[in-house]
Amino acid sequence: MSFFRGLRRTNKVYNDPSGFITDHAQLIRNQTPAGFNLNNPTTMGLANGTYVPGYNINGAFISNTNVNTVLRNNDVVGMRQLFPDASNNQMNGLTNLRRADNIPDATLHGLQTRKNGVKTSHPETAVRDRVGVENALAQNPRLADYLRGAGYVTLFGVSVYLVINVADLVSSIVEALNRTGGSWYYRGNNGGDNFSNIDACVLRYRSCGMSLADIDEFVCELDPHDPNNVDPLLSFDEARNFCNGYSLAAEGSVCRGSDTNADPSTLQYLDISELEPNQTVQCVEPYDFGDLIGDLGLDWLLGENGFVTASSNSLTSVSNNFTTILLVIGGILLLTFIGFVIFKVVNRSSNNNTS
């Protein structure tokens, strides 16, 4: 039993608090690496009579789900907050444990961090409509030039693809955004530490707010010989009925059963404890332009001056050039005048000598 396997097996709610105490003793206590204090298991009761497992860490209740998320994601900031006594070497040591279990979460977390960074640094990209996309392209001309110069090609990311129509680039981008979203199922292999080693597909029957046309190219085929194998945790009948009564307005997500960090009383909550450690399910909400830029790895094209600033710079440049021209002309006139004075003086001196 590996450390991350034990964390995964206990990432659920319990009907009896003693159940977690027993599981912790069998699955986690003797597998916990040095520096990570998980020696005080406890639970917190919910209104429906179930119990959230967790730990008393530095006098505070920290849910087991939170511990799972932080450690699987390689969330260094989160680890320092939860485990301030852990050294850099101890935190780095978790990388080998994640790699041994082929855990994909750190790679996925890195992508999410990049997407968030794009929108934090360039808030104009947090848009989904034509006007917003046009404005973002105008403020980032190098990105616009790159996309227009790419020609009629398709750019592939992790959860999105962009079919570029040079004749109407903005429509191409908006259409790509409208195709994003859904319950994504990730499986790590060969370490799971880069996207080349992560298999990804969309779980159709958990993607309640997405039309099949928008996700069809990504829908999971878990077993080519068994069309009824459509979900890693649900039977075919359970899957077919999973979205009954779905309401985007009421639920606020395009997914059901795809978020381990959701309130356990909601339809968005996922009991992931039966999945292998190298697998995870995450809800990807529909992208905005900043998400698309981060997913396609185009963030290096951001940051140049936009049209208005560029125009201002052009005017400044023209003004500077005009000043330079005036200075050159003035210098030439001054040199001509000095030359004329010298010529007159020399000529007068020559005439006096002749006389």
Curated annotation (Swiss-Prot):
Keyword Transferase recorded: no
Q: Which GO terms describe its cellular component?
A: membrane; viral envelope; virion membrane
- The reply to whether Transmembrane figures as a keyword in the UniProt entry is yes
Q: How does it sit in the membrane?
A: Multi-pass membrane protein
Q: Which Pfam families match?
A: Baculo_E56
Q: Which residues are modified by glycosylation?
A: N178
Q: Which residues form a coiled coil?
A: none
Keyword list (alphabetical) reads: Glycoprotein, Late protein, Membrane, Transmembrane, Transmembrane helix, Viral envelope protein, Virion
> TM segments?
150-170, 322-342
Localization annotation: Virion membrane
- Which residues form each disulfide bond in the chain? none
Described function: Structural protein that is specific for occlusion-derived virus (ODV) envelopes but not of budded virus (BV).
> What family is this?
Belongs to the baculoviridae E56 family.
User: Any further remarks?
Assistant: Expressed late in infection (24 hours post-infection).
What is the protein name given in its UniProt record?
Answer: Occlusion-derived virus envelope protein E56
Q: Which organism is it from?
A: Cydia pomonella granulosis virus (isolate Mexico/1963) (CpGV)
Organismal lineage? Viruses, Viruses incertae sedis, Naldaviricetes, Lefavirales, Baculoviridae
